[in-house]
């Protein structure tokens, strides 16, 4: 699973996701992509599950680019612990995704296979997504 090798701080504020994505909103590498349509936190486990679904459906043909990286730690207190006594220990890593952000890109497969693979990947994510394709030039 993806997580940073080294961070400046161990814990992060909860934060809010405002506005729409300006960077990472267009296809940069592949011919087809999966674009987020809502603001959401996506965990490293969910990204990995989507990646596996993608590559398995494509039968390891073509190429996959993951355009997001989970760099925000989410802390959690243990079960049955009283409130107070500070913030909990880091539990998982997430990425804050704004609407319009491209999550995955693929290339080297047909349009039908790409759409099916990205639909399977989208089912693993807690967010509404849209299939996008590069306009034929």
Swiss-Prot record:
GO cellular component, one term: cytosolic large ribosomal subunit
Keywords on record: Ribonucleoprotein, Ribosomal protein, RNA-binding, rRNA-binding, tRNA-binding
GO molecular function: rRNA binding; structural constituent of ribosome; tRNA binding
UniProt KW Ribonucleoprotein keyword: yes
Pfam families recorded: Ribosomal_L16
InterPro entries in the record: Ribosomal_uL16 (IPR047873), Ribosomal_uL16_bact-type (IPR000114), Ribosomal_uL16_CS (IPR020798), Ribosomal_uL16_dom (IPR016180), Ribosomal_uL16_sf (IPR036920)
Gene Ontology terms describing biological process: translation
Database matches in PROSITE patterns: RIBOSOMAL_L16_1 (PS00586), RIBOSOMAL_L16_2 (PS00701)
Oligomeric form and interacting partners: Part of the 50S ribosomal subunit.
Its biological purpose: Binds 23S rRNA and is also seen to make contacts with the A and possibly P site tRNAs.
Family membership: Belongs to the universal ribosomal protein uL16 family.
Protein name (record): Large ribosomal subunit protein uL16
Organism: Nitrobacter hamburgensis (strain DSM 10229 / NCIMB 13809 / X14)
Gene that this polypeptide is encoded by: rplP
């Amino acid at each position: 699973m993806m997580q940073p090798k080294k961070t400046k701080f161990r814990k992060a504020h909860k934060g809010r996701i405002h506005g729409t994505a300006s960077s990472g909103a267009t296809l940069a590498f592949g011919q087809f992509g999966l674009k987020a349509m809502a603001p959401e936190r996506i965990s490293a486990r969910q990204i990995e599950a989507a990646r596996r679904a993608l590559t398995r459906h494509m039968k390891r043909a073509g190429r996959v680019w993951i355009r997001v990286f989970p760099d925000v730690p989410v802390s959690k207190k243990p079960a049955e612990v009283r409130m107070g006594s500070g913030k909990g220990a880091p539990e998982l890593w997430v990425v804050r995704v704004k609407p319009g952000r491209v999550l995955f890109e693929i290339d080297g497969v047909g349009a039908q296979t790409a759409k099916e693979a990205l639909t399977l990947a989208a089912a693993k994510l807690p967010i509404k997504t849209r299939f996008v394709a590069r306009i034929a030039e």
